[in-house]
Amino acid sequence: MPRTVLLVILWAAVAAVLVALPHALSFSQQEILVFMTINLLVVASYRLLTLTGEWSLGHVVIVGVGAYASALYTKELGIPVPVSMLLGACTSALIAMGLSYPLFRMKGFYFLIGSFAAGEIIRLLWKRFREPFGGPKGIKGIDPMPDFSIGIWDFDFFEPVSYYYFAGAVVALCLWLLWRIERSPVGLTFHAVHWQDKLAQSAGVNVRAYRTLAFVVASGFAGLAGALGAHYIGTINPNGFDVETMVFVLTWTIVGGTATFYGPLMGCIALTVLNEIVLREMGFEQMRPLIYGAVLILSILFLPKGLESLVQKLVKPRRVEP
Amino acid sequence: MNPFLEIDRLTMRFGGLTAVDGLSFTVEHGAIHGLIGPNGAGKTTTFNAISGFYRPSGGEVRLRGEVISGLSMHEVARRGVIRTFQHSTLFAEMTVLENALMGTHMAFRPNVFAAIVGWDREDRRGAYARAVEALEFFGLEGLRGERAGDLAHGHQRALGMAIAYAAHPDVVLLDEPFTGMNPEETTRMMELMRKLRDSGVTILIVEHDMHAIMGLCDRITCMSFGKLLAEGGPAEIRSHPDVIEAYLGGARHVS
Amino acid sequence: MFDLLAQTGLNALYAASYISLVAVGLVLIFGVMGVVNFAHGELFMAGAYVVVALYAGGGAPFLLAVAAGLGFVGLLGLLMEFALFRPLRDNPLGGLVASIGFLMILQATAVMGFGVRMEHIPPVTQEVIAFSEKVRLPMSRLYVIVAAVVLLGALWYFLKRTRFGWALRASAQDAEAAALQGISIGQTARIAMFIGAGLAGVAGALTAPLVSVNPHMGHSVIVTAFIVIIVGGVGSLEGAVVASVAYAFVHTLVTTFWDGVIADIVGLSLMLVVLIVKPTGLFGTADRA
Ligand SMILES: Nc1ncnc2c1ncn2[C@@H]1O[C@H](COP(=O)(O)OP(=O)(O)OP(=O)(O)O)[C@@H](O)[C@H]1O
Ligand SMILES: [Mg+2]
């Protein structure tokens, strides 16, 4: 029992810090905090996809699918925002389901390039078709989350702090779901498909179905992240989901490491803090990409297993028992 | 009544090379059936064609009269045919227990929603029990927390079989299960295989250890250059002139 | 109509010549090093900036600036080999990530050195060959076409007729086997990186007066190069050239009759179809994935 008590106290402390955190930050830092929170969901969903061993370059576009879908549902169909976000997530999952048919005929490097091509085609369609996607300028004036109040607390979702609480709660729930999936027999099967797809097949695993499952579930969560972002910023455009953004996601994931659930989250937090806060405060505006690139190279050279490997050295991993 | 497992004029070509050439034989239900032949004879290729790893260039494989050749590997597995691999093919990064758990995949099919909500407790418990049973059967229960890639060679072979065993197969195809085992381990493993057979599992085994094959098999098929060379009981095969010839002179290369 | 087609053909020929220089370099690096060099577009960009600095800024002769572009970017390739790909030899994904880091560094350096605005470079020549009223080929484009043919011819000669070229092709097939034949892996890697990067640099240098030079110009170049090497077959140099020509014609044609974005979509769709139907590419046989 004392372990459980300890865990409860630990998590309560973490929650308290997370709740108090925005009040210690400046306004612009609060905004960054909101984006970072949403990005945590993006990298966590990306990791689910990589569990089966495939690396996609189309994930950010899938995030964009959720953003565009949710924005359009509110704008064109008048669907209320929280519902449209969920529908946006479903749209991403559905699109991923459709893409899985051509894409999972490929593996490895070919999948990487194929996912890039598929994503880029979707992005160019947004750019090309003014109706309904708004062309290169994208969609402006996306409905925000409606204000609401619980008792004494009023949430005005133009305020980064309010939106941080909202997005934080959603993201925390999603991370918990992703974690449950990973720790389940389904997650074990994902790992198995990654390490030895032949052996997995000979144990009766439908490898293609599991790859698709990981892709679709990951895309659903990615779409939700996109929708969360769209209704906060209020405007989206095709360039926001281009390959450069994808490179950031890839970098967070790799610098953090992909062997553990927390690796990509660590990567996202560490690099966001470095990029947005440390380098900005130090006044290296133009040099930021340079330092970022250098950090990327140094970490892959000297910390190839990611930041998570530092933690793993400290805490011996415990193995699953039911 | 249909024969249990029937390999019928099976042919497998790779470009110009015909690795299996019109091979036919049948495996009786509940038998331990050996498939032998010199290196490069096409034994592994035959296994690959039976288990759905390859789509045969010609011929058929039938299980209880149903054609299973051309199905994909997991579909063949779901019909009860489970294979092991010649080289220690394991989920090297996972623990021994997790490896065995993968063997229970078909009996306890995972489900995302159940897993999230927590409605799969029963299944998880069942899978765990089955996995532990498989490890115990092959004497691996003490190693369940080890990383599979760190195991000694003999243990790795045993774990490969434990995964197959956990899947409740009707037929297992074992490709050189005794390599990397010392004589005691081999003897123990032979005992386990007889036990496995007695529990109703049909075994098709490829093995170069003649001592083991002769001591274990009810029936043996010998192939060379992809073709059937001889078939019969151990005594017949041991004294069959073509078999002796193939092993002494006809082999393309000697191991 | 005929005029339009002829003009489109000339435009495509020009596009094909610099695309194939870039793509052949990318294939060479992938073949020998086994890494996908994401920074290849930025090597192209670096070549263009050498011309900006030496020819537009320093008043050096154009050809000298182009040669300097080849040499300088070739050296960047050697630097990448030494600092990134050699230490990461056993980690192809790591090599890819490192090349992304290098890409960011190159881009940021260009931004800091030259600013984000487009550079306007004085044209090398104003002359135009007019085949008819509407079919015209500017001399400066002809130079690019001629240079590409000469360089690719030289590369072909080098690969097929010299010992080093033979070594390079051998290690692209099978590095271990080539090493057993007494060919140093390190040496072939350095040659491949110098040539591969140099080709991207020279392509950027040659086209610099004809395009808008800016720090982000590499992006569309690398996308095009990927399409081309996939369609041509990842391991095949000849395939890369043929696919460059084919892609340039299709892209230019669609751009002329519809618009550039549709042309990009068509190009990407072509690549996707090839990936689905024949992942080894139209000319490739080796499966190195
Ligand atoms: N995927 C393949 N492509 C081309 N040739 C193959 C392939 N697989 C096997 N072969 C060839 O088919 C022949 C039979 O090989 P196979 O592995 O079935 O022999 P084997 O009887 O299992 O030999 P061993 O006892 O050494 O395991 C060999 O000549 C081999 O080179
Ligand atoms: Mg074999």
Regions found by a protein language model. Give the residues of each.
Chain B
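Glycine-rich phosphate-binding loops of nucleotide-dependent enzymes
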Residues: N2-S255
